[in-house]
């Protein structure tokens, strides 16, 4: 017998929302992380564990992602970065790669359809990584949602696609070198062409740290990095940015992640806040 005549889920959702508000009011008595990064590990193992059809783990993982992003938004976290697809993932079986690409395209197109809702919540969506490696439909869709949400600022969702940290560092060095070269160029007023006056160039022009960091894909640096499945490897993710970052590795597979894991990550960050702030000053 249906006691609530189909309304029970909405009642429980409402109750859960108020309970979260109470929990957040306690957590916000301490510092809240500005930026939380995630490695979504365990979708495949979750599918095997529950005998799901191919792709079932990724679909369950997407639902978990929506919940986690909701918690971050409600808690007042400003930035969330998701390791959505590594360049190294291209080494997987072609049909697996294509499935993930199709799923990403489907979800991005879904975001485009819900553009008004995303803008109402003031959410900015940014794709970061070597986006030239994406196929044209996916690249076009990503560009469309980025342009549509570019002016939003309350919550910034960074999706690392076709990303590895080593590729990012190479990109940052290349762009910094180009910037350095441009600073040595002097425009000829006669025809507008730029020439380099060798005699006026410095014999050694180093790239400064601030210049390199300006050309990385992902800023600001994360305060907490959560990797599910109990793994502590960074897997070529944010190697440059995690010098001063808490690593939290719950044993839950990614589709099993919940509010308690996000809360515990925030508490860990608060416990080590003083040390992390001192370390930041030391690194300056």
From Swiss-Prot:
Tissue specificity: Predominantly expressed in latex.
TM spans (from-to): none
Active site annotation, chain numbering: 41
GO-annotated molecular function: ditrans,polycis-polyprenyl diphosphate synthase [(2E,6E)-farnesyl diphosphate specific] activity; rubber cis-polyprenylcistransferase activity
The EC number(s) this enzyme carries: 2.5.1.20
Catalytic activity: (cis-prenyl)(n)-diphosphate + isopentenyl diphosphate = (cis-prenyl)(n+1)-diphosphate + diphosphate
An annotated GO cellular component: endoplasmic reticulum
GO BP annotations listed: polyprenol biosynthetic process
Coiled-coil region list: none
The entry's keywords: Transferase
CDD domains attached to this UniProt entry: Cis_IPPS
KW Transferase (keyword) present: yes
Highest rank taxon of the organism: Eukaryota
Presence of keyword Flavoprotein: no
UniProt record similarity statement: Belongs to the UPP synthase family.
Function: Proposed to be involved in rubber biosynthesis as a particle-bound rubber transferase responsible for the cis-1,4-polymerization of isoprene subunits. Probably requires additional factors for the production of high molecular mass rubber.
Name of this chain's protein: Rubber cis-polyprenyltransferase HRT2
Species of origin: Hevea brasiliensis (Para rubber tree)
Source lineage: Eukaryota, Viridiplantae, Streptophyta, Embryophyta, Tracheophyta
Gene: HRT2
């Amino acid at each position: 017998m249906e006691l609530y005549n189909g309304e029970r889920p909405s009642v429980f959702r409402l109750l859960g929302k108020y309970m979260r508000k109470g929990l957040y009011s306690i957590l916000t008595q301490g510092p809240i992380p500005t930026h939380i990064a995630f490695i979504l590990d365990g979708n495949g193992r979750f599918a095997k564990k529950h005998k799901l059809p191919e792709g079932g783990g990724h679909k369950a993982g997407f639902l978990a992602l929506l919940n986690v992003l909701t918690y971050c938004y409600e808690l007042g976290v400003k930035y969330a970065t998701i390791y959505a697809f590594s360049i190294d993932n291209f080494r997987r079986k072609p049909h697996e790669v294509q499935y993930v690409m199709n799923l990403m395209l489907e979800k991005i197109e879904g975001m485009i359809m819900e553009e008004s809702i995303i803008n109402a919540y003031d959410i900015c969506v940014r794709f970061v990584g070597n986006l030239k490696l994406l196929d044209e439909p996916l690249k076009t869709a990503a560009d469309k949602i980025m342009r549509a949400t570019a002016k939003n600022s309350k919550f910034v969702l960074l999706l690392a696609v076709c990303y590895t940290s080593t590729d990012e560092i190479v990109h940052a060095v290349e762009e910094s070198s180009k910037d350095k070269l441009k600073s040595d160029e002097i425009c000829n007023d006669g025809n507008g062409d730029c020439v380099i006056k060798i005699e006026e160039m410095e014999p050694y022009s180093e790239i400064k740290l601030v210049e390199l960091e300006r050309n990385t894909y992902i800023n600001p640096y994360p305060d907490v990095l959560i990797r599910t499945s109990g793994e502590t490897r960074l897997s070529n993710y944010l190697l440059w940015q995690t010098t001063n970052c808490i690593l939290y590795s719950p044993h839950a597979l990614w589709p099993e992640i919940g509010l308690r894991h996000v809360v515990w990550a925030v508490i860990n960050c608060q416990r080590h806040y003083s040390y992390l702030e001192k370390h930041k000053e030391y690194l300056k």
